Amino acid sequence: MGLSDGEWQLVLNAWGKVETDIGGHGQEVLIRLFKGHPETLEKFDKFKHLKSEDEMKASEDLKKHGTTVLTALGNILKKKGQHEAELAPLAQSHATKHKIPVKYLEFISEAIIQVLESKHPGDFGADAQGAMSKALELFRNDIAAKYKELGFQG
């Protein structure tokens, strides 16, 4: 399920847009995740108290965590599928410490695509969306394989 060179280029072009305001994009991704799937908020002790979208938008901690999430994902995407070194510690922490199910990674993938679609409609058409979906699916499949190695049934 690899991506072609052209698809990777579409992914990296879109990611370049994210990096122009990684904190803003990250915050919006997390807000969409928490609003669309409130159960995911339970995995974040630091953010459980944030009940409204306004509270989430005002949270510097949420913005910082969004930056952390998208920076890590960007480092993985830039490896164009050759991301074993970057993925292993992420899978380890998400399986053993945070206990994040793969389903939640599907939810955040949807949120990432929605944010890119809304913030960059002219630069994130059907081809770019399809390529990003494939890249995020590759990431999730590889995380799921690592989870299995670690004995986490997430």
From Swiss-Prot:
InterPro entries (UniProt xref): Globin, Globin-like_sf, Myoglobin
Catalyses which reaction(s): Fe(III)-heme b-[protein] + nitric oxide + H2O = Fe(II)-heme b-[protein] + nitrite + 2 H(+); H2O2 + AH2 = A + 2 H2O
Signal peptide: none
Modified residues (Phosphoserine): S4
Ligand binding (heme b): H94
Modification sites for Phosphothreonine: T68
EC number(s) recorded for this UniProt protein: 1.7.-.-, 1.11.1.-
CC annotations in GO: extracellular exosome; sarcoplasm
Pfam family, one: Globin
Assembly: Monomeric.
Similarity annotation: Belongs to the globin family.
Chain's role: Monomeric heme protein which primary function is to store oxygen and facilitate its diffusion within muscle tissues. Reversibly binds oxygen through a pentacoordinated heme iron and enables its timely and efficient release as needed during periods of heightened demand. Depending on the oxidative conditions of tissues and cells, and in addition to its ability to bind oxygen, it also has a nitrite reductase activity whereby it regulates the production of bioactive nitric oxide.
Entry protein name: Myoglobin
Species this protein is from: Ctenodactylus gundi
Gene behind this protein: MB
